[in-house]
Regions:
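SAM/dcSAM-binding transferase cores
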Residues: 194-242
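Mobile active-site "lid"/loop adjacent to the S-adenosyl-L-methionine
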Residues: 118-145
């Protein structure tokens, strides 16, 4: 169930009327695909969608959600408070740059899983909606600074998972390599079988993978319905999936 102000999932509701990034396919895919751990960090949490998905999938986890935007921060607080997972989630209004240098320096805690649906319109003109523009524009979170923070805050055996446009795959992999991170999972996502892959689900680690996990998946079948892979991945979340 969805409306202009919220999106209802099986076990939680996400209101997104106050923040720039609305509930969308990218966030749902990442939240359903990323590996978890005892401690999880959601960078740029927006409405709290991915935070709540990870909390549902990994019931023993402790999750930290951060966002630099005041309205997104407040929206996540409200969405988390309405959920059954509130006791395991902490939310902070801060940038990942500041979080990595100040908060972690004081607490000396690192994360087993870091997730991020990053801003990626690196060279494009900003959209008229300033909040959405800030959420989607890489000026607020350069890839180099993102990877520097991940390198600092992730455990030696942790994973950093993201979803990005295929156009940025090369520069993203290069930046990861500069910060000592190895690509261990790569899922190329096509809307339909005849189209090129527009999105990439990526997972990075500090250790080279024993076996590289690479796959190409299609979101819609020939009739325009969700593919079996997409349905299987999101079955625990979408109301129309059994």
């Amino acid at each position: 169930m969805t409306s202009n102000n919220y999106f209802a999932f099986k076990r939680f509701i996400v209101y997104h009327d106050k923040c720039g990034m609305k509930v969308g396919t990218d966030g749902v895919l990442l939240g359903a695909w990323a590996n978890g751990g005892k401690r999880i960090l959601d960078i740029g949490c927006g409405s709290g969608l991915i935070t709540l998905m990870m909390a549902q999938r990994f019931p023993e986890s402790e999750i930290i959600a951060i966002d630099i935007d005041k309205d997104a921060f407040q929206q996540t607080i409200e969405n988390v408070a309405r959920s059954e997972f509130a006791e395991r989630i902490s939310i902070f209004q801060t940038s990942i740059q500041r979080f990595a240098t100040q908060y972690e320096a004081e607490n000396n805690k690192k994360y087993d899983s870091i997730v991020c649906n990053p801003p990626f319109f690196v060279n494009s003109l900003k959209s008229p909606d300033s909040k959405r523009s800030a959420a989607r524009h890489a000026k607020t979170l350069p890839f180099a600074e993102l990877f520097a923070a991940v390198e600092k805050t992730m455990t030696d055996k942790g994973e950093f998972s993201v979803i990005i446009p295929t156009d940025y795959l090369g520069v993203f992999k290069a930046e990861a390599s500069l910060h000592g991170l190895f690509l261990n999972r790569k899922y190329s996502l096509k809307t339909t079988a005849k189209k090129a892959a527009k999105r990439q689900l990526l997972s990075f680690s500090k250790q080279p993978p024993l076996k590289f996990d690479e796959s190409e998946q299609t979101l819609l079948d020939n009739e325009g319905k969700k593919s079996e892979w997409y349905k299987g991945l999101t079955r625990d979340f979408y109301l129309d999936e059994k």
